[in-house]
Protein backbone atom coordinates (compact mmCIF):
# COMPACT_ATOMS: atom_id res chain seq x y z
CA UNK A 1 0.00 0.00 0.00
CA UNK A 2 2.85 2.37 0.75
CA UNK A 3 4.34 1.88 -2.74
CA UNK A 4 0.91 2.46 -4.27
CA UNK A 5 0.70 5.83 -2.54
CA UNK A 6 4.20 6.82 -3.71
CA UNK A 7 3.60 6.29 -7.46
CA UNK A 8 0.87 7.51 -9.78
CA UNK A 9 0.26 6.83 -13.47
CA UNK A 10 -2.10 9.44 -14.90
CA UNK A 11 -4.13 9.64 -18.12
CA UNK A 12 -6.08 12.70 -19.29
CA UNK A 13 -9.16 10.75 -20.34
CA UNK A 14 -11.18 7.68 -19.45
CA UNK A 15 -11.58 6.54 -23.09
CA UNK A 16 -9.55 6.92 -26.29
CA UNK A 17 -5.86 6.60 -27.12
CA UNK A 18 -3.57 6.38 -24.08
CA UNK A 19 -6.65 6.50 -21.86
CA UNK A 20 -7.41 4.83 -18.56
CA UNK A 21 -9.35 2.06 -20.32
CA UNK A 22 -6.57 1.64 -22.90
CA UNK A 23 -3.93 1.16 -20.18
CA UNK A 24 -6.05 -1.28 -18.19
CA UNK A 25 -7.06 -3.28 -21.27
CA UNK A 26 -3.43 -3.48 -22.44
CA UNK A 27 -2.19 -4.73 -19.07
CA UNK A 28 -5.13 -6.82 -17.88
CA UNK A 29 -6.77 -8.02 -21.09
CA UNK A 30 -10.17 -9.63 -20.57
CA UNK A 31 -9.61 -9.92 -16.81
CA UNK A 32 -10.70 -6.28 -16.49
CA UNK A 33 -14.33 -7.24 -17.19
CA UNK A 34 -14.32 -10.22 -14.86
CA UNK A 35 -15.40 -10.53 -11.27
CA UNK A 36 -12.87 -8.68 -9.06
CA UNK A 37 -12.19 -11.98 -7.27
CA UNK A 38 -10.52 -13.08 -10.52
CA UNK A 39 -8.26 -10.03 -10.73
CA UNK A 40 -4.56 -10.76 -10.18
CA UNK A 41 -3.07 -10.43 -6.72
CA UNK A 42 -1.19 -7.15 -6.33
CA UNK A 43 -3.52 -5.18 -8.62
CA UNK A 44 -4.15 -1.60 -7.42
CA UNK A 45 -7.87 -0.82 -7.09
CA UNK A 46 -9.96 2.26 -6.38
CA UNK A 47 -13.21 2.53 -4.46
CA UNK A 48 -15.81 4.21 -6.68
CA UNK A 49 -18.15 5.51 -3.99
CA UNK A 50 -18.49 6.34 -0.32
CA UNK A 51 -19.13 3.38 1.97
CA UNK A 52 -18.95 4.84 5.48
CA UNK A 53 -20.05 1.55 7.03
CA UNK A 54 -16.73 0.12 5.82
CA UNK A 55 -14.68 3.25 6.50
CA UNK A 56 -14.17 3.80 2.75
CA UNK A 57 -14.53 6.99 0.73
CA UNK A 58 -14.81 7.59 -2.99
CA UNK A 59 -11.27 7.53 -4.41
CA UNK A 60 -9.67 5.40 -1.69
CA UNK A 61 -6.89 3.26 -3.16
CA UNK A 62 -6.35 -0.37 -2.23
CA UNK A 63 -4.70 -3.50 -3.50
CA UNK A 64 -5.83 -7.06 -4.20
CA UNK A 65 -4.29 -9.95 -2.28
CA UNK A 66 -4.94 -13.65 -2.75
CA UNK A 67 -6.88 -15.26 -5.56
CA UNK A 68 -10.28 -16.80 -6.23
CA UNK A 69 -12.35 -17.41 -3.10
CA UNK A 70 -9.39 -16.27 -0.98
CA UNK A 71 -9.21 -12.89 -2.77
CA UNK A 72 -9.31 -9.87 -0.48
CA UNK A 73 -8.74 -6.13 -0.76
CA UNK A 74 -6.49 -4.10 1.51
CA UNK A 75 -7.35 -0.44 2.12
CA UNK A 76 -5.86 2.13 4.47
CA UNK A 77 -8.62 3.55 6.67
CA UNK A 78 -8.85 6.04 9.50
CA UNK A 79 -9.50 4.40 12.87
CA UNK A 80 -11.78 5.75 15.60
CA UNK A 81 -8.68 7.01 17.42
CA UNK A 82 -7.59 9.07 14.41
CA UNK A 83 -4.79 6.70 13.46
CA UNK A 84 -4.48 4.95 10.12
CA UNK A 85 -5.09 1.22 9.93
CA UNK A 86 -5.40 -1.39 7.21
CA UNK A 87 -8.77 -2.94 6.48
CA UNK A 88 -9.05 -6.34 4.77
CA UNK A 89 -12.31 -6.73 2.82
CA UNK A 90 -13.95 -9.27 0.54
CA UNK A 91 -14.38 -7.78 -2.99
CA UNK A 92 -18.14 -8.44 -2.93
CA UNK A 93 -18.53 -5.90 -0.12
CA UNK A 94 -17.40 -2.99 -2.31
CA UNK A 95 -20.26 -1.63 -4.43
CA UNK A 96 -18.10 0.11 -7.06
CA UNK A 97 -14.58 -1.11 -7.58
CA UNK A 98 -12.23 -0.46 -10.50
CA UNK A 99 -8.66 -1.37 -11.37
CA UNK A 100 -6.30 1.51 -10.60
CA UNK A 101 -3.07 0.75 -12.45
CA UNK A 102 -3.63 4.26 -13.80
CA UNK A 103 -6.00 7.05 -12.79
CA UNK A 104 -7.53 9.91 -14.72
CA UNK A 105 -5.98 13.27 -13.93
CA UNK A 106 -9.40 14.44 -12.74
CA UNK A 107 -9.60 11.53 -10.26
CA UNK A 108 -6.10 12.29 -8.96
CA UNK A 109 -6.91 15.90 -8.04
CA UNK A 110 -6.05 16.36 -4.39
CA UNK A 111 -3.57 13.46 -4.46
CA UNK A 112 0.20 13.65 -4.55
CA UNK A 113 2.91 11.06 -5.05
CA UNK A 114 6.68 11.04 -5.03
CA UNK A 115 6.79 9.73 -8.61
CA UNK A 116 4.19 10.58 -11.25
CA UNK A 117 4.04 9.29 -14.83
CA UNK A 118 1.71 11.08 -17.24
CA UNK A 119 0.57 9.49 -20.51
CA UNK A 120 -0.27 12.32 -22.93
CA UNK A 121 -1.94 11.26 -26.22
CA UNK A 122 -0.93 14.18 -28.44
CA UNK A 123 2.05 16.49 -29.02
CA UNK A 124 2.04 19.48 -26.67
CA UNK A 125 2.09 21.87 -29.64
CA UNK A 126 -0.80 20.09 -31.37
CA UNK A 127 -3.41 22.37 -32.99
CA UNK A 128 -6.00 20.17 -31.25
CA UNK A 129 -4.66 21.26 -27.86
CA UNK A 130 -6.91 23.64 -25.95
CA UNK A 131 -6.91 25.59 -22.71
CA UNK A 132 -8.65 22.69 -20.96
CA UNK A 133 -5.78 20.38 -21.98
CA UNK A 134 -3.21 22.82 -20.61
CA UNK A 135 -5.04 22.99 -17.29
CA UNK A 136 -5.25 19.19 -17.16
CA UNK A 137 -1.53 18.88 -17.83
CA UNK A 138 -0.77 21.47 -15.14
CA UNK A 139 -2.89 19.49 -12.67
CA UNK A 140 -1.05 16.29 -13.57
CA UNK A 141 2.39 17.89 -13.21
CA UNK A 142 1.56 19.34 -9.81
CA UNK A 143 0.70 15.88 -8.41
CA UNK A 144 4.46 15.04 -8.39
CA UNK A 145 6.45 15.72 -5.21
CA UNK A 146 9.85 14.45 -6.43
CA UNK A 147 9.86 13.21 -10.03
CA UNK A 148 7.73 13.41 -13.15
CA UNK A 149 7.83 11.32 -16.33
CA UNK A 150 5.84 12.80 -19.20
CA UNK A 151 5.22 10.40 -22.08
CA UNK A 152 3.99 12.15 -25.23
CA UNK A 153 3.05 10.90 -28.67
CA UNK A 154 5.79 12.04 -31.09
Q: For the regions a protein language model found, what residue spans apply to each?
A:
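Conserved helicase/translocase motor-coupling segment
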Residues: 1-63
Amino acid sequence: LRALEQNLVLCPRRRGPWSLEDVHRSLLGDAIAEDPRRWPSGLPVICGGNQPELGLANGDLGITVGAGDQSRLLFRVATDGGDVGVKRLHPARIRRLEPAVALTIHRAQGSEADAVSVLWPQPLDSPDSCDHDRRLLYTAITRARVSLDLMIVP
